[in-house]
């Protein structure tokens, strides 16, 4: 009789007869803009551009392979610099962790290759490594690549993707802003071309130095570009900023960019610029 008045259990444990199959890591990718989930291989086949137009981040190697002709790329070795100039606590361990995770030595990869037959020196920042922050190694790599381009009389491009100066290197990091700008000035004085392509995100000391010094300043759609953060600016001026503030489209309308170029059109865009500024074309017009 007591069993009749007992309350039924609210929860019932069900045993699964089959072992759950885990989805492999990296099989699917979710777009942060439209929330679409699609196969990663399908996204990569479309240059990592979602159907909604959102440009997913590229690795440095992917950027080189998308822009340059196959079989023409020669990567530069990183210049030898002290990895931890200020003996910052835990910094060496963080560097090693990023090196293992990304397979990179630092937050930048530099090299030379051909874009539809036109030679070009390129520096590509990779935000996976210390958020693409600029330290002594990054500054030295950019400076040496520009020095090589000046010596060989080649155009140069830099793909920026950075959170700014690397805080663990303090003043040494800030010095790279002036150092890279100086080498770009020498490159410009030699009458050579520099194209700056800003990708998401390009902020801090990078946006205040070499990223904005191009003969052509272009950016990918939807890229965040600016020096200080949105919240800091709003608190300083005590005003609400536009929703599209610090986007590449906003900067284009304000006249701070020459163009916003989709990833699908980037190689064609570079080809036109390099063709116009090649030495052969210049000699033909003299």
From Swiss-Prot:
Any GO BP: malonyl-CoA biosynthetic process
Pathway named in the protein's UniProt entry: Lipid metabolism; malonyl-CoA biosynthesis; malonyl-CoA from acetyl-CoA: step 1/1
GO cellular component, one term: acetyl-CoA carboxylase complex
Protein name: Acetyl-coenzyme A carboxylase carboxyl transferase subunit beta
InterPro entries linked to this entry: AcCoA_carboxyl_beta, Acetyl_CoA_COase_Trfase_b_su, ClpP/crotonase-like_dom_sf, COA_CT_N, Znf-ACC
Subcellular locations according to the entry: Cytoplasm
Source species of the chain: Exiguobacterium sibiricum (strain DSM 17290 / CCUG 55495 / CIP 109462 / JCM 13490 / 255-15)
Ranges of residues in domain CoA carboxyltransferase N-terminal: 27-286
Family: Belongs to the AccD/PCCB family.
Task of the protein: Component of the acetyl coenzyme A carboxylase (ACC) complex. Biotin carboxylase (BC) catalyzes the carboxylation of biotin on its carrier protein (BCCP) and then the CO(2) group is transferred by the transcarboxylase to acetyl-CoA to form malonyl-CoA.
UniProt keyword annotations, A-Z: ATP-binding, Cytoplasm, Fatty acid biosynthesis, Fatty acid metabolism, Lipid biosynthesis, Lipid metabolism, Metal-binding, Nucleotide-binding, Transferase, Zinc, Zinc-finger
Assembly information from the UniProt record: Acetyl-CoA carboxylase is a heterohexamer composed of biotin carboxyl carrier protein (AccB), biotin carboxylase (AccC) and two subunits each of ACCase subunit alpha (AccA) and ACCase subunit beta (AccD).
Superkingdom assignment: Bacteria
Chemical reaction(s) catalysed: N(6)-carboxybiotinyl-L-lysyl-[protein] + acetyl-CoA = N(6)-biotinyl-L-lysyl-[protein] + malonyl-CoA
């Amino acid at each position: 009789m007591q069993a009749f008045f007992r309350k039924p259990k609210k929860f019932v444990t069900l045993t699964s007869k089959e072992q759950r199959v885990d989805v492999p890591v990296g099989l699917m990718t979710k777009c942060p803009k439209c929330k679409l989930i699609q196969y990663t291989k399908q996204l990569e086949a479309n240059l990592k551009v979602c159907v909604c137009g959102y440009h997913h981040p590229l690795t440095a190697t992917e950027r080189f392979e998308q822009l340059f002709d196959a079989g023409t790329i020669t990567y530069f070795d990183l210049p030898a610099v002290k990895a931890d100039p200020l003996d910052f606590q835990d910094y060496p361990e963080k560097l090693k962790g990023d090196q293992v995770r990304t397979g990179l030595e630092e937050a930048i990869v530099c090299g030379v290759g051909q874009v539809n037959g036109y030679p070009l020196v390129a520096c590509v920042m990779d935000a996976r490594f210390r958020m693409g922050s600029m330290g002594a190694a990054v500054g030295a790599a950019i400076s040496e690549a520009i020095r090589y381009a000046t010596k060989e009389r080649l155009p140069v491009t830099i793909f920026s993707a950075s959170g700014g100066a690397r805080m663990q290197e303090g003043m040494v990091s800030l010095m790279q802003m002036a150092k890279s700008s100086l080498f770009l000035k020498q490159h410009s004085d030699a009458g050579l071309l520099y194209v700056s392509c800003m990708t998401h995100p390009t902020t801090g000391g990078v946006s205040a130095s070499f990223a904005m010094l191009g003969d052509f300043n272009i950016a990918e759609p939807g890229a965040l570009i600016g020096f200080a953060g949105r919240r800091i600016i709003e608190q300083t001026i005590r005003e609400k900023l536009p929703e599209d503030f610090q986007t590449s489209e906003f900067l284009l309308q304000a006249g701070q960019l020459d163009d916003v170029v989709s990833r699908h059109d980037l190689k064609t865009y570079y080809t036109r610029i390099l063709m116009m500024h090649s030495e052969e074309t210049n000699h033909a017009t003299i």
